[in-house]
Amino acid sequence: MTAASPADEHAMRLALDQAHNAWLVGEVPVGAVILREGKVVATGYNRPITTHDPTAHAEIVALRHAAELLSNYRLPECELYVTLEPCAMCAMALMHARFKRVVFGAPDPKTGAAGSVLDLFAVEALNHHTELVGGVLAEPCGDLLRGFFTERRAERLAERLAERRADRLADRSALGRAGLAELAGDEDAPAPIPTGEATELPADSLLPPT
């Protein structure tokens, strides 16, 4: 990996803006920006959930936009900035597109393919090698992801608690209905007195005079 520059940090902040957009629509907050000669060509953020497309990672979304705009699937003059270390799918797509440089923010210890789990960018047998920079604004990039998942866990916990409360209320209601049904089937049980109506009781049910 090579060192980052102030220009890299500026571009990564643009990618962070895209990551915030992903959060707003309920997606895992990962954002990407593609630059050519220092100018923004395309942007993208995670969209697998909203598009029902498992390949719609931020890098792929931005890559598709750039390729369409530039009318070329090869982008050798372009650099891509992404807030999370690329997975194997994205890493290979970026190399197939012949990107000059890839810069990422936070490492991904579960699926990262730029050094965390494996490093596809370092495989010498591949026919194209892309310059790689990692850890640019890693802390804010990671904080955004941690905040998102903390919020998601809290929401799921609240949903489970609400479901349990609803189940308890339903159980109590069912027990109450069962009790009324049991009384209704008891021949010796007195008939319920309608609310707001006077009812004359049978003579044999009256208390003897004192």
Pin down the residues of each PLM region.
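A short, polar/acidic, helix/strand-boundary loop motif
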Residues: 2, 48-49
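Short beta-strand scaffold segments in enzyme catalytic cores
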Residues: 30-38
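A short, polar/charged loop-to-alpha-helix boundary motif
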Residues: 50-61
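Zinc-dependent deaminase
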Residues: 1-22, 92-210
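Small-residue (primarily alanine) positions within well-ordered alpha-helices
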Residues: 15, 19-22, 32, 42, ...
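Short beta->alpha transition motifs characteristic of CBS
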Residues: 41-48
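Immediate flanking context of iron-sulfur cluster ligation sites
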Residues: 72-84
